[in-house]
Amino acid sequence: MRLQDKVAIVTGAGSGIGLATTLLFAREGARLVLNDIDQQGLETLLTDVGKEKGRAVVGDVALEETARSLAQEAVSAFGHIDVLVNNAGVFFDKDITDMTVEEWERLMDVNLKSMFLCCKHVIPHMLRQKKGAIVNLASINSFIGMELEGVSTFAYCITKAGALQLTKSLTTRYAAEGIRANCVCPAFIETNVLKHRGTPQWVAELWRAAGAALPIGRPGQPEEVANAILFLASDEASFVTGCPLLVDGGYLAR
């Protein structure tokens, strides 16, 4: 097992990429401290994982108290922290002229500030053991702006560019202290993020069009991103740090 006896924190664990990552980590032997704002979903997931292998911290990870509690729970329950997966994220389909200040701040808080807060409270524990792995969820939008059919991504792109630069800054600061920091950069992963954006037919057509835009010819699945996260979190990636790992079906190779 690639994460046998390692302790991993996963934010946004209740759905999508976070859910797929949690289930994969559990199969690979990790002990888990899971966060989501959805209490019911997190409790169901904890049942699937097994309470002997998992703990749950329900709350808004954009709040410092939640990030602090995640680190404290991991150390209290399992003694140390080996892996941090900063996965929590939100998406607002608003153009710059329509987005409210509150929506802008919420995007920045969940997609970027939460990464800062979790790193702030986890890194001291990793420094004491002189080892750790951080995996941030970035995006192809860390590199490019993008407008889909009727979907504005401008503010989301800004947060993901920040996630990439956070990863690079963590690398230059902490690589010599045994802490690796990497990010995965997915494109068009078929989750429920757009479920309430339009009719089921509209959503299905959007995913079809997204898949057609990729050289591989289809959208990705959360499990495919989880596999990349597992690699970066594992000792197999012991010489990999500062890496933006593309999981994009060839999109940026065009």
Which residue ranges define each predicted feature?
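Canonical Rossmann dinucleotide-binding motif of NAD(H)/NADP(H)-dependent dehydrogenases/reductases
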Residues: L3-L32
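Short, small/polar-rich loop/turn modules that mediate ligand/substrate recognition or access, typified
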Residues: V85, A175, R180, V240-G242
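Substrate-binding pocket helix/loop in short-chain dehydrogenase/reductase
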Residues: D95-I96, E103-M108, I134, L206, ...
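Active-site helix of classical SDR
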Residues: C119, T159, T167
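Alpha-helical segment proximal to the catalytic Tyr-Lys
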Residues: P124, K168, T172-A176, S238
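Residue(s) in the substrate-gating loop at a strand-loop-helix junction
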Residues: S139
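Short C-terminal tail/terminal secondary-structure segment
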Residues: I144, L230, T241-R254
